């Protein structure tokens, strides 16, 4: 079982915590993490883009000029794709970009991302993280004590004081344990996570 230091909000080590091998100690699968990130980004796409074909553009019902005798090229509609203001050929139309991955693959990707944080020594476990009131300055000080500037801050449950204190800091994102995902774990250098949040993640993934 990997052991990591346990810190308080002043950046002082107050002990050690053992992490479960099956969640934080596996060999990271880069390809699986890549697939999970692709899925997450694809599923965020709205897919509402649309262009009008020659059948949908307004006008163009009348033949611009007669077929023969004018010396000009043949034309059947002023909304032909080769004309100005004509319809669009092969343009985008509304579609669903959603990608699905098997549950086992999604879990493996999440375990891989968590394990990579341990391997790279980019995980900081806190004994607790509570704030009396939302104050960005206090959160900046806490993260400064922990030497974690670009960080994903994870708590066991939603804490509005922590969330409001962290959300306006550039390069910092607050999350609750059940919202942890591969994309954010890879995007942010440090994972600042409470001991309770670790237990909650292990309970779900172990």
Swiss-Prot record:
Keywords: Ribonucleoprotein, Ribosomal protein, RNA-binding, rRNA-binding. One of its GO terms (biological process) is translation. InterPro entries: Ribosomal_uL4, Ribosomal_uL4-like, Ribosomal_uL4_dom_sf. Pfam families: Ribosomal_L4. Residues 47-59 have a biased composition (Basic and acidic residues). Residues 60-71 have a biased composition (Basic residues). GO terms for molecular function: rRNA binding; structural constituent of ribosome. Residues 43-78 are annotated as: Disordered. GO terms for cellular component: ribonucleoprotein complex; ribosome. Belongs to the universal ribosomal protein uL4 family. Part of the 50S ribosomal subunit. One of the primary rRNA binding proteins, this protein initially binds near the 5'-end of the 23S rRNA. It is important during the early stages of 50S assembly. It makes multiple contacts with different domains of the 23S rRNA in the assembled 50S subunit and ribosome. Forms part of the polypeptide exit tunnel. This is Large ribosomal subunit protein uL4. It comes from Desulforamulus reducens (strain ATCC BAA-1160 / DSM 100696 / MI-1) (Desulfotomaculum reducens).
């Amino acid at each position: 079982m990997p052991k990591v230091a346990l810190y308080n909000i002043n950046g002082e080590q107050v002990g050690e915590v053992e992490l479960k091998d099956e969640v934080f100690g596996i060999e990271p699968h880069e390809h699986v993490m890549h697939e999970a990130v692709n899925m997450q980004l694809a599923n965020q796409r709205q897919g509402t883009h649309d262009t009008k074909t020659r059948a949908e553009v307004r006008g163009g019902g009348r033949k611009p000029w007669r077929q023969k005798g004018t010396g000009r090229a043949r034309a059947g509609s002023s909304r032909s794709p080769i004309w100005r203001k004509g319809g669009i050929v092969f343009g985008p139309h509304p579609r669903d970009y959603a990608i699905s991955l098997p549950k086992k693959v999604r879990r493996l990707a999440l375990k891989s991302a968590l394990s990579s944080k341990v391997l790279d020594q980019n995980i900081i476990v806190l004994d607790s993280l509570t704030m009396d009131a939302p104050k960005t300055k206090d959160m900046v000080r806490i993260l400064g004590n922990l030497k974690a500037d670009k960080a994903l801050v994870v708590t066991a449950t939603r804490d509005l004081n922590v969330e409001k204190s962290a959300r306006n800091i550039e390069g910092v994102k607050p999350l609750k344990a059940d919202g942890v995902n591969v994309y954010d774990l890879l995007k942010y250098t440090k994972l600042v996570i409470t001991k309770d949040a670790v237990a909650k993640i292990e309970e779900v993934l172990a």
